[in-house]
C-alpha cells in the first residue's frame, strides 16, 4: 500500500506520559544492583506493573519472587529489592531475620503516604485508607500499622456504609494511583458524614497520576479511539482508560504491546488519543505509533499540559555506580 492510499489519522500524543520518577528510580535500582553485585538480584514482586520491564530485567539477571522464602539458601548473600509499591513493615523485618541484604525501591511518594498514616495513628486517630483491596500499595500501607487500626474504603457506597467506632477521631490517606475525580467524591462523602475527618498534610495522590489524568481529559474529546499503554494489573493505567471515556473518547482500550491491536475492531478512525501509564516504557509508545503509521497516513500532535522535572535519588549504596544510556536502553530506546 502506498502512502497516498493510506487513510489520514491524527494521533494526539499526551504529555506527560509513561514513566514517573518513582518508576524510573525503581528500575534504576535493579539495574544498578546488577551492575554492582552481579546476577542474580532478587526482586520481591514485580518491580513495577509492566511485563515488558520485568522481562527486560530478567534478561539482565533479575529474578522475581513473591515471597522471601523463595530465595535459595545459596543466594542469600545476593541483594533483594522491594518493589516500587511498598511493603508491609513485616517484610524488611523478615529479611533481617534471614540475614538478607535488601534495597528498598518503594516510591518516595508512597513512603510519604506511609508516614502520613503513621502520623494519624500516632496522634490516636483511626486511619481510613481510600484505595483498592489487594493492590500491593494498599497492602504495604495497611502493613505499616497495627492490625485493626486501618479501615479500607473503595467506593462512595463503602463510605455510606462505614460505621467507625469513634466517628470524631478519623484521619484519611489514599492510594497514590487512584482516579482523582472518584477519590474526590469519596472524600467529600466521608467529610459530609464525618465533619471532623482529618486530611493528610499533603495530597496522597501523586503528581504523575494527576498529570497523566489531566492531559488525557484534555485530549480525549473528539477521539474515535484512545489507547492507554499499560498492564492490566496497573492501577494508574486502568484509571486512564476510565478517564478517557468519561472525558469524551468514543472508545478507550488498554494495550501492553502493538501485537495486541485488533485492526478489525479498530476499523476506520480519524483521531486517536495515545498515552501511557506510569509504569509503561516509551519504547512501547513508539511501537504503537509505528504500527499505526504502517496502516495510516499518521500525523502526531503533542497534547501537553505540564513538563515534569521530578527526580528521585537511588539508594545511597548505589549512587557511586555509573548509570549509562545503554543500561536503560531496553525501556527508553
From Swiss-Prot:
GO terms assigned for molecular function: 4 iron, 4 sulfur cluster binding; 4-hydroxy-3-methylbut-2-enyl diphosphate reductase activity; metal ion binding
Binding site for isopentenyl diphosphate: 49, 85, 135, 234-236, 279
Keyword tags: 4Fe-4S, Iron, Iron-sulfur, Isoprene biosynthesis, Metal-binding, Oxidoreductase
Listed Gene3D superfamilies: 3.40.50.11270, 4-hydroxy-3-methylbut-2-enyl diphosphate reductase, catalytic domain
Assigned EC number: 1.17.7.4
Details of cofactor binding: Binds 1 [4Fe-4S] cluster per subunit.
EC class (word): oxidoreductase
Residues the entry annotates as binding (2E)-4-hydroxy-3-methylbut-2-enyl diphosphate: 49, 85, 135, 176, 234-236, 279
GO biological process assignments: dimethylallyl diphosphate biosynthetic process; isopentenyl diphosphate biosynthetic process, methylerythritol 4-phosphate pathway; terpenoid biosynthetic process
Catalytic activity: isopentenyl diphosphate + 2 oxidized [2Fe-2S]-[ferredoxin] + H2O = (2E)-4-hydroxy-3-methylbut-2-enyl diphosphate + 2 reduced [2Fe-2S]-[ferredoxin] + 2 H(+); dimethylallyl diphosphate + 2 oxidized [2Fe-2S]-[ferredoxin] + H2O = (2E)-4-hydroxy-3-methylbut-2-enyl diphosphate + 2 reduced [2Fe-2S]-[ferredoxin] + 2 H(+)
Annotated catalytic residues: 137 (proton donor)
Pathway in which this enzyme or protein is active: Isoprenoid biosynthesis; dimethylallyl diphosphate biosynthesis; dimethylallyl diphosphate from (2E)-4-hydroxy-3-methylbutenyl diphosphate: step 1/1; Isoprenoid biosynthesis; isopentenyl diphosphate biosynthesis via DXP pathway; isopentenyl diphosphate from 1-deoxy-D-xylulose 5-phosphate: step 6/6
Pfam families per record: LYTB (PF02401)
Residue numbers binding dimethylallyl diphosphate: 49, 85, 135, 234-236, 279
Required cofactor(s): [4Fe-4S] cluster
Binding residues annotated for [4Fe-4S] cluster, in chain numbering: 20, 107, 206
Protein family per UniProt: Belongs to the IspH family.
Function of the protein: Catalyzes the conversion of 1-hydroxy-2-methyl-2-(E)-butenyl 4-diphosphate (HMBPP) into a mixture of isopentenyl diphosphate (IPP) and dimethylallyl diphosphate (DMAPP). Acts in the terminal step of the DOXP/MEP pathway for isoprenoid precursor biosynthesis.
Database matches in PANTHER family: 4-HYDROXY-3-METHYLBUT-2-ENYL DIPHOSPHATE REDUCTASE (PTHR30426:SF0)
Protein name, per record: 4-hydroxy-3-methylbut-2-enyl diphosphate reductase
Amino acid at each position: 500500500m502506498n502512502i497516498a492510499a493510506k487513510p489520514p489519522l491524527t494521533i494526539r500524543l499526551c504529555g506527560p506520559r509513561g514513566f514517573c520518577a518513582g518508576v524510573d528510580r525503581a528500575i534504576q535500582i535493579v539495574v544498578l544492583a546488577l551492575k554492582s553485585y552481579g546476577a542474580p538480584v532478587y526482586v520481591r514482586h514485580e518491580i513495577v506493573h509492566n511485563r515488558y520491564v520485568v522481562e527486560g530485567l530478567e534478561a539482565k539477571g533479575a529474578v522475581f519472587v513473591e515471597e522471601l522464602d523463595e530465595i535459595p539458601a545459596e543466594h542469600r548473600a545476593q541483594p533483594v529489592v522491594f518493589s516500587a509499591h511498598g511493603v508491609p513493615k513485616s517484610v524488611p523485618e523478615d529479611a533481617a531475620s534471614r540475614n538478607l541484604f535488601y534495597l528498598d525501591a518503594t516510591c518516595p511518594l508512597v513512603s510519604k503516604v506511609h508516614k502520613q498514616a503513621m502520623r494519624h495513628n500516632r496522634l490516636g486517630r483511626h486511619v481510613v485508607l481510600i484505595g483498592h483491596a489487594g493492590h500491593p500499595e494498599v497492602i504495604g500501607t495497611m502493613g505499616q500499622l497495627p492490625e485493626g487500626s486501618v479501615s479500607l474504603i473503595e467506593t462512595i457506597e463503602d463510605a455510606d456504609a462505614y460505621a467507625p467506632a469513634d466517628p470524631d477521631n478519623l484521619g484519611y490517606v489514599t492510594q497514590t494511583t487512584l482516579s482523582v475525580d472518584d477519590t474526590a467524591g469519596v472524600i467529600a462523602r466521608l467529610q459530609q458524614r464525618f465533619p471532623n475527618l482529618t486530611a493528610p498534610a499533603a495530597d496522597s495522590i501523586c503528581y504523575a497520576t494527576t498529570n497523566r489524568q489531566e492531559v488525557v481529559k484534555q485530549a480525549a474529546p473528539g477521539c474515535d479511539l484512545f489507547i492507554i499503554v499499560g498492564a492490566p494489573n496497573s492501577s494508574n493505567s486502568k484509571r486512564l482508560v476510565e478517564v478517557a471515556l468519561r472525558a469524551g473518547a468514543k472508545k478507550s482500550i488498554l494495550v501492553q504491546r502493538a501485537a495486541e491491536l485488533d485492526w478489525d475492531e479498530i476499523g476506520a478512525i480519524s483521531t486517536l488519543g495515545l498515552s501511557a501509564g506510569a509504569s509503561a516504557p516509551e519504547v512501547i509508545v513508539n511501537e504503537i505509533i509505528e504500527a499505526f503509521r504502517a496502516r495510516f497516513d499518521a500525523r502526531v500532535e503533542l497534547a501537553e499540559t505540564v513538563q515534569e522535572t521530578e527526580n528521585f535519588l537511588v539508594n545511597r549504596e548505589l549512587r557511586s555506580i555509573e548509570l549509562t544510556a545503554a543500561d536503560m536502553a531496553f525501556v527508553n530506546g
